[in-house]
Amino acid sequence: TQAGEYLQYVGRTELTLRGRKVVARRNRLIPVASMTAEDPTVKAAIKKFYDESSLNEVIGRVTVRIEGKEGLGNLVTDAEAAVNGADFAFQNAGGIRIGALEPGDMTAKMVYEMDPFGNEVNVVELTPEEMRDLIRVSHRYNKRRHAVDLLVSGMTYTLYTKNGEPDRIEMAFPDGRPLEEGRYYRVALNDYIVSAYKFPHARAAKPTGKSSEETIIEYIRSRKEIAPQAPRTKLIEE
């Protein structure tokens, strides 16, 4: 089992059975840094993955350095919005697992390194107030207290906090126009956000049948060159 986050630990659970009944249980955390021995079977499986020809195929080109959660999250959300015909898209910062993409060729393997979880993209219709509720809830999950958790495409937003707690949120289209209150907009997001971020909304999310990685690869293939614009979010403590 896995425990903690960012591969800090592996969790080991030992069960003692009497017949079909568990009579004792022992749990412990094993720091990954202490695990120095290599398993040849696992090593061979990893090598097979990295040698896969389809993963090393060039799918597009990065024209500028794309760095940090914001820049990379903008790429992910741009892809999910464009491929699914959504007005907006959100991506949790914790799902971005590399630091930057350098200018040059982009391969499918680089997409899987950036976004390795295989989450399915969903589309849900939300009002501006429901999106604000989502952003407020996301901040309570947020360990990056100096920045927002949810990266976005299709809009810009500013989250104002008081004593570290989310307060008011200002949202606008990139050209500065306000969103229409009460209107339902198509919003793309991954199924982790759908299941983990408990926020009030009236309409159910619908799966697209495609993972976020498949969606990003499709988007990059169609664009050939990528250079997402940033920043789109702000966090201000009042």
What is each residue range found by the language model?
Residues 3-238:
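Catalytic centers of hydrolytic enzymes
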